[in-house]
Amino acid sequence: MKMTFRWFGEGYDSISLDKIRQIPGKPGIVSAIYDVPVGEVWPEEKIKKLKETVENAGLELEVIESVNVHEDIKLGLPSRDRYIENYQQTLRNLAKFGIKVVCYNFMPIFDWTRSDLAKVLPDGSTALSYEEEKVQKVDPNRMVEEVEANSNGFELPGWEPERLKTLKVLFEQYKSVDEEKLLKNLGYFLRAIIPVAEEVDIKMAIHPDDPPWSIFGLPRIVKSKESLEKIMALVDSPYNGITLCSGSLGANPDNDIPALIRYFGAKGRIHFGHVRNIKIHSLRNFDESSHLSSDGSLDMFEIMKAYHDIDFKGYIRPDHGRMIWGEVGRPGYGLYDRALGIAYLNGLWEAIGKMKKVC
């Protein structure tokens, strides 16, 4: 298991690499290029600069999150082939600089969705939160405005302004796209992408829908064991893999996260793990919590044990954290709570390994 930490890059993150380097275990960096429009080729010089910046700080960069998929690909429009060719070239460029895993998602229009970016928890910390009634009743344009107003001046991943300017047009286009068609469009994309991924030795890792159910009537196809099996079957290759996000899939209590890790891990399809906890209050209503098992609804010991049991060699990172100790930054991506998360997850990993030796 290789522990990592997401960093949004100079000018896009309130956290500096020298602070990340001080986290026990010195995690690897997960990052991306944020000033290239979705669908365009990532230039080699930008990738090189990012790689050198990370390495000059004494850290490693082997995982990219994310190379976003253009909406025309998800919609299956004739223009998708140009964007797919650009995606292929981006993979080739990334491979030249030692990138091993690319995380991506296939969620229509919106990436992760929350009703509150700074809900005050009983301990005084703030966290991302989801209330089904609020989300389904709010106008999508209003939600975009609220996200922009409450992001502390940062552009949030999956909520890039250039993608959301055409919201009305996108919703109209998606009226003719159901889950079956979206899955078909994903298959078209994967059949073009995976051969290139195999050629350049980059593992593709699809991220689950967050949350794992439909919002605003949009289709969702990455939400359960059954849906993940369908996606793996689209292209039967170890390079067609998964980012197993415990918080995303775990928002639905029907998803047994340790069982999913063992099932898809045994098939060699998990390349990246997002390990975080959530507190489920009722069906489709949850807050994000600290990583500690007792603070949420997921058993983090069992999750890490499942990874240990499959002898996981891929990458893991703590996911969204609370904002604690007065920190102000990108919602969900502060330093302190995620650093605590790394210490906790590393502690579980060490303890599990030593317990096995004793037993």
From Swiss-Prot:
GO terms for molecular function: ferrous iron binding; manganese ion binding; mannonate dehydratase activity. Gene3D superfamilies: Divalent-metal-dependent TIM barrel enzymes (3.20.20.150). GO terms for biological process: D-glucuronate catabolic process. Its cofactor is Fe(2+); Mn(2+). Pathway: Carbohydrate metabolism; pentose and glucuronate interconversion. Keywords: Iron, Lyase, Manganese. SUPFAM superfamilies: Xylose isomerase-like. Its EC number is 4.2.1.8. InterPro entries: Man_deHydtase, Xyl_isomerase-like_sf. It catalyses: D-mannonate = 2-dehydro-3-deoxy-D-gluconate + H2O. Catalyzes the dehydration of D-mannonate. PANTHER family: MANNONATE DEHYDRATASE. NCBIfam families: PRK03906.1, uxuA. Belongs to the mannonate dehydratase family. This is Mannonate dehydratase.
